[in-house]
Structure formats: C-alpha cells, structure tokens
C-alpha cells in the first residue's frame, strides 16, 4: 500500500508520471483542502463559545487558567525563574510542567495578550482572570496555533503520501477525518489546550520522513518532544524507522551521526537557558516527570485503570515497582514493530509503527490521563484510508472515554454535536468507498456492532444519571 522508501516519482491512475504540484492541480486537492479547512476552522470557532476547563471554579480553576498563568509567568519573570519555586512563582499554583518550547509558546501568546489586554497577564493580579475579552483572545491563540501548525502539516502529509494515487473523494474524506477529529477539537477548543502544536509538528516530521528529508524530520520531532513530553509516545517508531533506513545506506555510522547531531542541536537550542547550570537543568527535568501524581489520572481507558477494578495496583505495589512494571510492559509491546522497522523499514510500516508505539504507551506507561488518547488517535487518523473500520471504532471509544471530562467541563452539547458530525462525515455520500460497503455487514457482525453502540449509549445514560447523585453524596460528606 505504502510508497517504497526513496521513491521520487509516482504514477497516477492512468500510468503517467506526475509530481506533487501536477497532482494537486489535476485532482483539485488544493481546493478541497481549503474548503474542508475553512469548515474545520468554523467548527472550532463554534466549540470555543462553550465553557472551558475550570470556568468560574476558584481557587485553582482548570487548564484554561493554567495556560493563562504560564503566559503571566513567562512574560513577567526571567527564563531561569520559570520552573523554580519562589515568592513570585508558586509552583503549587499551576507551575510549568511541560518542556521549554511550551514556555516559549506561552511567552509569545502572552505578548499578544499584553498588547490588547494587559490586565489578563499582569503578575499576581491576573489570577483567575476571566473577562470576556481575555477569554476571546485566549481562544484566538489556540485557533491561530491550529492554522499555523496543524493545518499546514496535514496538507504536507496528504501531498507527500498520497501524490499520484487515490480518488479525490477519498483524499477529501481523509482530510476531513483528520482536521475534524472530534476529540482534538473538544480538548483544544473546548477544554482548552494546545495539543495542535505538538501534533502538528509530529505530522510535519512524518511528512518529512515520507519525503526522505530525515534531518528535517529529526528537527521537527525534537521540537514536538520539547513542546509536550508525551510526544515520546511516538519516539520508538521514529527511532526504529530512521535506524533501519540508516543501516541500509553506504555509511550507516555517518548517517546516524548526522541525525544525532540534528537532535542534539535542536535540544541544545531549546534548552539553552537551562544547560549552563546542572541545578537549573535538573529542576526542569523534575517538573517534566511528575511521578507523584500516580499511575493514572481520572477515567483513563488504559490497562492499569481498567484492570484496577479487579487488581488494586496502587495498593499492591509501590510507585517504584509500578514504574518498572509499566516501563517493561511498554517496551515489550513496542518491540515487535520496532524490530520490523529496523529489519525492513517502509513508509506504511512506519505509520503502523507510530500507531503501535503510541498505543503501547497509552495502555501501559506510567502517569497517563484521559487526554493522552489524542496521541494514538493521530496515526490512526493518518491511516484512516487503510483502516477505516478500526479508525471509526477507535474514535468512537476515544470520545466515550472523554465523556466524564466533557461533563465536568459542561461541554456535553458540543460533545454530542461533534459525535454526530463525525458519523455524518464518516458515512458521507461520495466519501470513502469502503465505509459505504461496511454499512451492510454480516448478520453476526451487525449484531455485535449494534450491541456495542447500545452499550455506549447505556454507559452515557448511567454516568449522566449517577453523576449528580455522587456530587450530592460528596457534598453531604463535607
């Protein structure tokens, strides 16, 4: 299915040679992408009018306040103070716990807010700031991040990977599945985060690898790692694929060295304010690995949380033991696809390796929260044309796993709307041909699918029914 590594020229459906630009014009993909991108942008705008994490809920509010507070800190304090506990930077109040690139992003967005609404990022006095204009500016920072990072990266991936093959309607369907992923929209534009930046950088790195620009890929993926450390979910796939390609070249040691220098150089530039002092360096590292939070957070649909109903992991094992257990479980489940890519690297195998690697981390790694499902969803979205059935059900249950968070953030209305929109687009007339064929499966398969959908609806109803009751009981205990 995938293009062979190093293939420079593709064939179109008529067998003629073509390049990316010819394909874009001939298939009119550029116009399709623009229309879908505009619609995806408007959907994001609509979702952003709804509440966000911790809205009107003092004293610590939620992720919205965390992002605003990081802008306040990075704007008003020198870089060496950003990760250090002090009288001006209380790390117990939403202290920075992401790598330096997130801090730089917060600084740039803070400059934008200070120009138009300085009181929203003033030191100390802006805590819990929730003015209408401040919220509007904050929402625009996420929207602009999507436009600058995610949208161009998706376009590059489609051009690089699908040039010369595939029907126009299939490509348009794939673009819609990626740009209108309901989970990402709800987390970034509802709950309030900037996952679009790290995911956009990762997609850009994938596109660079598929076009044999390994040095560019190393820089982009290093930037993704330095924006959100959870991008390490993809690291085994990148490492094994690039190593496999290097080993097949004339001078493998030189090739590996070049890629290593690109990674080290990128990290050195990003970490420059902190590499001059071991104390400062270790201080940042300690903020990036919050093991004290425990094995998992909230209602995360991974192995440890699911099996905790029967096996009380947190009671039976110490944190140190669980760290080792989760580490080896993650490594062992990543290993098959890593070995395959080192032995026989291919573009399609690389995409499946990304899926396997990210799922291994999501299911078995230490300290996973419900928003981490966005990471395995990314390669699943990129593979939606190859695996439409599995992509649909992964998205379905990813949304279901996020439902408690959406209830807590009062985002049930956009949750239901995006759930419906996803299925409308998935089965859209003229969309992916395989999806229409699957509308009439075998009787057993049809029964199982219907049963699973009913179970999902039942779980939604149970949670909505019981959640108010648990809130009342907890308030009575207090």
Question: What are these regions, as identified by a protein language model?
Answer:
Residues 1-51, 155-162, 166, 171-172:
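Start-transfer (signal-anchor) and selected internal transmembrane alpha helices
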Residues 64-116, 121-144, 181-202, 251-380, ...:
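Membrane-interfacial catalytic/cofactor-binding modules of polytopic membrane enzymes
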Residues 31-44, 146, 175-176, 262, ...:
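Alpha-helical transmembrane segments
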């Amino acid at each position: 299915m995938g293009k062979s590594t190093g293939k420079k020229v593709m064939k179109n459906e008529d067998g003629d040679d073509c390049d990316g630009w010819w394909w874009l014009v001939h298939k009119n993909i550029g116009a399709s992408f623009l229309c879908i991108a505009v619609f995806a942008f408007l959907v994001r705008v609509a979702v952003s009018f709804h509440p966000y994490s911790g809205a009107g809920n003092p004293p610590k509010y939620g992720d919205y306040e965390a992002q605003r507070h990081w802008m306040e800190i990075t704007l008003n304090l020198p870089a060496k103070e950003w990760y250090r506990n002090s009288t001006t930077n209380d790390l117990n109040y939403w202290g920075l716990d992401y790598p330096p690139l997130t801090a730089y992003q917060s600084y740039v967005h803070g400059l934008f807010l200070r120009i138009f609404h300085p009181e929203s990022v003033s030191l100390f006095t802006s805590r819990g700031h929730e003015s209408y204009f401040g919220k509007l500016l904050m929402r625009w920072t996420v929207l602009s991040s999507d436009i600058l990072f995610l949208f161009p990266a998706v376009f590059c991936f489609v051009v690089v990977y699908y040039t010369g093959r595939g029907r126009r309607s299939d490509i348009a369907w794939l673009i819609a599945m990626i740009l209108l992923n309901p989970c990402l929209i709800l987390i970034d534009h509802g709950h309030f985060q900037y996952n679009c930046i790290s995911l956009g950088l990762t997609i850009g790195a994938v596109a660079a690898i598929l076009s044999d620009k390994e040095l560019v890929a190393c820089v982009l993926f290093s930037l993704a790692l330095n924006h959100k450390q959870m991008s390490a979910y993809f690291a085994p796939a990148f490492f094994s694929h690039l190593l496999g390609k290097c080993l097949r070249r004339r001078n493998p040691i030189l090739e590996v060295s070049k890629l290593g220098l690109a990674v080290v150089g990128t990290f050195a530039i990003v970490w420059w304010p902190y590499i001059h002092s071991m104390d400062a360096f270790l201080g940042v590292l300690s903020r990036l690995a919050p093991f004290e939070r425990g094995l998992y957070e909230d209602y995360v649909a991974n192995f440890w949380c699911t099996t905790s109903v029967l096996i009380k992991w947190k009671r039976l094992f110490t944190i140190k033991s669980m760290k080792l257990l989760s580490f080896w479980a993650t490594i062992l489940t990543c290993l098959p696809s890593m070995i395959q890519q080192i032995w026989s690297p291919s573009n399609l195998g690389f995409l499946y390796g990304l899926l396997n690697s990210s799922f291994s981390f999501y299911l078995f790694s230490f300290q996973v929260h419900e928003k981490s499902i966005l990471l395995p969803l990314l390669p699943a979205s990129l593979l939606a044309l190859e695996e439409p059935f599995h992509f649909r059900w992964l998205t379905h249950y990813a949304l279901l796993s996020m439902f408690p968070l959406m209830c807590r953030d009062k985002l049930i209305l956009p949750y239901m709307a995006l759930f419906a929109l996803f299925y409308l687009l998935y089965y859209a007339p003229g969309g992916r041909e395989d999806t229409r064929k699957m509308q009439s499966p075998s009787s057993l398969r049809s029964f199982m699918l219907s049963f699973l959908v009913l179970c999902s609806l039942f779980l939604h109803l149970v949670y909505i029914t019981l959640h108010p009751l648990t809130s009342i009981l907890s308030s009575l205990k207090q």
